[in-house]
From Swiss-Prot:
GO molecular function annotation: nickel cation binding; urease activity
Alphabetical list of SUPFAM superfamilies matching this protein: Composite domain of metallo-dependent hydrolases (SSF51338), Metallo-dependent hydrolases (SSF51556)
InterPro entries cross-referenced by the UniProt entry: Amidohydro-rel (IPR006680), Metal-dep_hydrolase_composite (IPR011059), Metal_Hydrolase (IPR032466), Urease_alpha_N_dom (IPR011612), Urease_alpha_subunit (IPR050112), Urease_AS (IPR017950), Urease_asu (IPR005848), Urease_asu_c (IPR017951)
Record's protein name: Urease subunit alpha
Active-site residue numbers: H325
Annotated binding of substrate, by residue: H224
């Protein structure tokens, strides 16, 4: 016997289904569910009088070794770069076991082979919630450890960068220089509830000082103009990276002291490189570093202070620059240096280049001209701004924004994972990958997560008064959960290191308790590997007016006065 119910009632009980549309926060962005993996009438739902009970949705006999899940998230909106679907997410041994229909195959139709619910299974009710991969921020200045919780509570689960604390070198550059400092940061990483990887200092004209940092555990090298990003340093750094299969990130020469953007391109010589803040306000050849994004070997990212372009963007940048790069407002040359980096024309073009899929990644530049807790917010604010100013993207289905949404999600999930050689572990919701997931209420999407899961276990979330009779009374604030404590965090979180440091036993000698995994596949990639963000048009910059042209056409946009995902979400 079947029962018919309205779409509204169905969505209220089991969440939206195929063809239903959901607004992301208070933006103008709408996503549509493309497929529903659940089976109508056999949905899994937990609670009093619901279906996940012994002999019903829960197998009465299946033991944990019989492919029974450790955790299932039911009826969720699964939002990833490969699709926007409705279904159940199964997690086992800290990894994603599958996405599809979960339940008890003895009495339910269509249950996926690897998604059996049994007595060993915990349940999170995902009805009406959006689930995304944990975010990845690849431009971290590790200035203070408090950044890590701030990032985690915003939905970031992996942080890559460099630093040693509030040293002037760290304030300005994203480097953990030398074996001693790398070891100390790897040891410190043991205590933090996110995945971590550290970049060594890449500025050296000879190979030995760079090799010893990779062998000490650095997952890559960072070239920064404050250390002297000369053509020789660039070439040497990339030679070492090719030798050890690690990534190079670069902040180029704003002052054009050792050469211009063409000289840097020549020094890179077609080798793969991650260009930080490729627009240039964060640093790089003035005024035309943005041109480098047209190269197939260049993996370009933005940092969030210029994203999106608003009426306040220019005013706040000068003071940020003076502090971060140890400049003196009384020295006219220092002021001129700062002024040369702040160009409204290239900042306006940056928004459009993201929307075109030319810029591939978003990151923070934490406490060094960027906000570590706003990578995800700024990404979706930019997507909203571009929809307002540019309309629907080519190929978009009328009334929804799936193409644009997937493009922007990729900028802080799968693309940074591919760039830094960790996409086999994290960056997407796919079978076999580490279960780093973020759950959102649609109204809070991109701003305030409901819950963060790391390595298949709840590690952080919104929580009310601990003395209350139920979990929801105010004050509701973000708190670390059990996955962030004791020995649990050694299994829920990963430290990424170079393959060389594992093979030479350096990491083993440190006695690290966290799971340690090698980066790989950093040197054989190019822009074409950047999911939904692999465009390589010709980019030109007028040296006098700073106007940006893409394939011969000027691109620009107006700054916004009002953004979504802003004050109304942060009244308390």
């Amino acid at each position: 016997m079947s029962v018919k119910i309205s779409g509204k009632d169905y969505a209220g009980m089991y969440g939206p289904t195929k063809g239903d549309r959901v607004r992301l926060a208070d933006t103008d962005l709408i996503i549509e569910i493309e497929e529903d993996y659940t089976v109508y009438g056999d949905e899994c739902k937990f609670g009093g009088g619901k279906s996940i009970r012994d002999g019903m949705g829960q197998s009465p006999s299946a033991a944990r070794d019989d492919k029974v899940l450790d955790l299932v998230i039911t009826n969720a909106i699964i939002f990833d770069t490969w699709g926007i679907v409705k279904g159940d997410i199964g997690i086992k041994d800290g990894k994603i076991a599958g996405i599809g229909k979960a339940g008890n195959p003895k009495v339910m139709s269509g249950v996926s082979e690897d998604l059996i619910i049994g007595a060993s299974t915990e349940v999170i009710t995902g009805e009406g919630l959006i689930v995304t991969p944990g975010g990845i921020d690849t431009h971290i200045h590790f200035i203070c450890p408090q950044q890590i919780e701030t990032a985690l509570f915003s939905g970031i689960t992996t942080m890559i960068g460099g630093g040693t604390g509030p040293a002037d070198g760290t304030n300005a550059t994203t480097c953990t220089p030398g074996a001693f400092n790398i070891r100390k940061m790897l040891e410190a990483a043991e205590d933090f509830p996110v995945n971590l990887g550290f970049l060594g200092k890449g500025n050296a004209s000879f190979e030995t000082p760079l090799i010893e940092q990779i062998e000490a555990g650095a997952i890559g090298l960072k070239l920064h103009e404050d250390w002297g990003t000369t053509p020789k340093a660039i070439d040497t750094c990339l030679k070492v990276a090719d030798l050890f299969d690690v990534q190079v990130a670069i902040h180029t020469d704003t002052l054009n002291e050792a050469g211009f953007v063409e000289n840097t391109i020549a020094a890179i010589a077609g080798r793969t490189i991650h260009t930080y803040h490729t627009e240039g306000a964060g640093g790089g050849h003035a005024p035309d570093i943005i041109k480098i994004a047209s190269r197939m070997n260049v993996l370009p990212s933005s940092t969030n202070p210029t994203m999106p372009f608003t009426v306040n963007t220019l005013d706040e940048h000068l003071d940020m620059l003076m502090v971060c790069h140890h400049l003196d407002s009384k020295v006219k040359e220092d002021v001129a240096f700062a002024d040369s980096r702040i160009r409204p024309e290239t900042i306006a073009a940056e928004d459009i280049l993201h929307d075109m899929g030319v810029f591939s990644m978003m990151s923070s530049d934490s406490q060094a001209m960027g906000r570590v807790g706003e990578v995800i917010i700024r990404t979706w604010q930019t997507a909203h701004k571009m929809k307002l100013q540019r309309g629907a993207l080519p190929g978009e289905k009328s009334g929804c924004d799936n193409i644009r949404a997937k493009r922007y999600l990729a900028k802080y999930t799968i693309n940074p994972a591919i760039t830094h050689g960790i996409s086999q572990y994290v960056g997407s919701l796919e079978k076999g990958k580490i279960a780093d997931l973020v759950l959102w209420k649609p109204a809070m999407f991109g701003v305030k997560p409901e819950m963060i899961i790391k390595g298949g276990f709840i590690i952080a979330g919104r929580m009310g008064d601990a003395n209350a009779s139920i979990p929801t009374p105010q004050p509701v604030i973000y708190k670390n959960m059990f996955g962030a404590f004791g020995k649990a965090k050694y299994g829920t979180c990963v430290t990424f290191v170079s393959k060389a440091s594992l093979e030479n036993g350096v990491v083993e000698k440190m006695g690290l308790q966290r799971k340690v995994l090698p980066v790989q596949g950093c040197r054989n990639i190019s822009k074409k590997y950047m999911v939904h963000n692999n465009a390589t048009p010709e980019i030109e910059v007028d040296p006098e007016t700073y106007e940006v042209k893409v394939d011969g056409e000027i691109i620009t946009c107006e700054p916004l006065k009002v953004l979504p995902m802003a004050q109304r979400y942060f009244l308390f």
